[in-house]
Amino acid sequence: MFLEHREKEENKRQATAGYDLTDAYAQISYCLPGEPCPKTISLQADQEQYLIPALLGRYTDQDLWVYGPKAQAAAAAGEVFLVDGLLTKAAHQEMVEVGGQNYSSVALLSLFLKRTMSLLAPIVRPERLQALVFSVPEVSVPILSAVTDAVGMLGLKNASLFLIGRAESFFYYNICQPEELWKQDVLLCDFSGTFLHTLLFTANRKTSPVACFVEEADWKEVAAGREDLDQCFLETMKALIGDRNVSCVYLIGEGFLGEWYQESLRFLCQERRVFLGNNLYSKGACYAARQGMTCLLY
């Protein structure tokens, strides 16, 4: 990836959105005309509740669907048939049995996208978006096909649609931050799963244009539930960073809830900026939408 992307005409005069989608959660960020930075949709207006459970539920006694936390709560009460794993099921083109009826997994994914995109409506109607970028954990032909087909059912005729991986989303997020945050390497620690996943952003400023790289790695030994998790995370960070000049670290994912990583945090904060949050990927996708990408879904 090259920083010439940054020099393209941005879509600053139009509304854009970034949508991070996994089997577990969805998240939506948007940017309105003239605004410098994306904002993220929260399920609660007075809280930073950005993660939308990627769930659908159909009531057992009527043909009525709910999504997200409502589906989660209704399932706990035994009121709905719950459908999860929407992205993977759609990628596999599965037929999903719900309450004795079969449904297309792509159609179910499209329904979930429609319901979640409706959260944007009070701010900007989805059909008025200039560009919409989806960020997924891994880009593949089945995922591309599933998202393309599901989005195609939404009728977003005016929006340019894109699909990127999380590494590319991280790239766009970085280059849209103040340059002092990425003048050296940038590390992202993602603990949203059962083990740690890292992305390391580096920029070779000796080339023209500047060449940027994102190196991904899984650290399965840094797993949720370990009694010595702080020590294990600390040793992993020391090994990964080594003699690199890392100027900034992002900690994202529900695995970083609580205070279990105090020793690791003390190490990471030594001459580095450290940020804790969980909406980086959707913001990165939104920044990508503003940058005027070139690889369309359709």
Which residues does each predicted region cover?
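Early-domain small/polar-rich strand-loop-helix modules and first-structured segments
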Residues: M1-M95, G152, S160-I164, S169-Y172
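Conserved phosphate-binding/catalytic loops in two-lobed NTP-binding clefts
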Residues: L156-S169, E263-Y287
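A short acidic Gly-Thr/Ser loop motif
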Residues: K12, G18-Y25, E180-H197, T202-N204, ...
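A short acidic (Asp/Glu
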Residues: I28-S29, P142-V147, Y172-I175, L196-F201, ...
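Acidic, glycine/GT-rich loop-and beta-edge segments that sit at the periphery of enzyme/chaperone cores
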Residues: L280, Y287-Y298
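Small-residue (GG/TT-enriched) beta-loop-alpha framework at ligand/catalytic clefts
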Residues: F134, D149-C232
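Conserved phosphate-binding loops in N-terminal lobes of ATP-dependent enzymes
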Residues: S42-S135, D218-A239, R244-V246
